[in-house]
Swiss-Prot record:
Residue ranges with Polar residues bias: 24-33, 180-191
A GO biological process held by the record: protein transport
Gene name of the encoded protein: ZMAT3
Reported tissue expression: Highly expressed in adult brain, and moderately in adult kidney and testis. Not detected in fetal brain, heart, pancreas, adrenal gland, liver or small intestine.
A Gene Ontology term for the protein's cellular component: plasma membrane
Quaternary assembly: Interacts with dsRNA.
InterPro entries: Matrin/U1-like-C_Znf_C2H2, ZMAT3, Znf_C2H2_jaz, Znf_C2H2_sf, Znf_C2H2_type
Region listing for Disordered, in residue ranges: 1-42, 180-201
Localization: Nucleus; Nucleus, Nucleolus
Organism for this UniProt entry: Homo sapiens (Human)
ZnF endpoints (Matrin-type): 70-100, 147-177, 246-276
PANTHER family listed in its UniProt record: ZINC FINGER MATRIN-TYPE PROTEIN 3 (PTHR46786:SF1)
GO MF term set: RNA binding; zinc ion binding
Descriptive protein name: Zinc finger matrin-type protein 3
Length: 289
């Protein structure tokens, strides 16, 4: 029975081999290749990139030649220490010269100059804080006397430069001028205070003077003189009465003013009286009277 079943069943169909053209058509239909660029364009792109890289490398080499660890040929500045070199390369003047250099060579400047030029075989000392610099936390760092001179409006790159400035002639001259101005201002303020104090004392004394004047006016006596007491010359001291008037006992004449009394002394009447009195005195001395 088993043999008959095998004989009755038809043989399985074998897949017919497809022609080679159909395989080619199927592969081209499923796989799409990108369009190929011309040969001239493919060759031009790597050449342009190589030219830019070579140009940038040449400029970096030239910049390294210009910016030595202790001499900046770009700014024509000789540096004494690594601290001064770092301060110079991070300063405004060097940054300006560096931007001009890159603008002339039509190449963008690097992000940091300190990565390009570094002092060789020298310990790096932290740069003193400059005026107006900020930390990442937003804290303001105030400048010290080794960084900035407020009197001369000058900033320093190192303590040695600051010490040389403070010992120079320009700083000494400005210091003398500032001291002279401060002394003159203090003297003027003291003079103003003294004047105000004096005026205040005089103002306080004015009521006392007024009271004294009213007491004198109200007082009555034999020697009361309502006029202000005038200055009496020495030669007329014997001719002044207690009331303040001038009196000539020889002529029995009085005068209220000094000029009037002097005119009386120069008059003929007074001179004749004086001559008569002198003659009488002489005769009395001789014993004729």
């Amino acid at each position: 029975m088993i043999l008959l079943q095998h004989a009755v069943l038809p043989p399985p169909k074998q897949p017919s081999p497809s022609p080679p053209m159909s395989v080619a058509t199927r592969s081209t239909g499923t796989l799409q290749l990108p369009p190929q660029k011309p040969f001239g364009q493919e060759a031009s792109l790597p050449l342009a990139g190589e030219e830019e890289l070579s140009k940038g490398g040449e400029q970096d080499c030239a910049l390294e030649e210009l910016c030595k660890p202790l001499y900046c040929k770009l700014c024509n500045v000789t540096l004494n220490s690594a601290q001064q070199a770092q301060a110079h390369y991070q300063g405004k003047n060097h940054g300006k010269k560096l931007r001009n250099y890159y603008a002339a060579n039509s190449c963008p400047p690097p992000a940091r100059m300190s990565n390009v030029v570094e002092p060789a075989a020298t310990p790096v000392v932290p740069v003193p804080p400059q005026m107006g610099s900020f930390k990442p936390g937003g804290r303001v760092i105030l400048a010290t006397e080794n960084d900035y001179c407020k009197l001369c409006d000058a900033s320093f790159s190192s303590p040695a430069v600051a010490q040389a400035h403070y010992q120079g002639k320009n700083h000494a001259k400005r210091l003398r001028l500032a001291e002279a101005q401060s002394n003159s201002f203090s003297e003027s303020s003291e003079l103003g205070q003294r004047r105000a104090r004096k005026e205040g004392n005089e103002f306080k004394m004015m009521p006392n003077r007024r009271n004294m004047y009213t007491v004198q006016n109200n007082s009555a006596g034999p020697y009361f003189n309502p006029r202000s007491r005038q200055r009496i010359p020495r030669d007329l001291a014997m001719c002044v009465t207690p009331s303040g008037q001038f009196y000539c006992s020889m002529c029995n004449v009085g005068a209220g003013e000094e000029m009037e009394f002097r005119q009386h002394l120069e008059s003929k009447q007074h001179k004749s009286k004086v001559s008569e009195q002198r003659y009488r005195n002489e005769m009395e001395n001789l014993g004729y009277v």
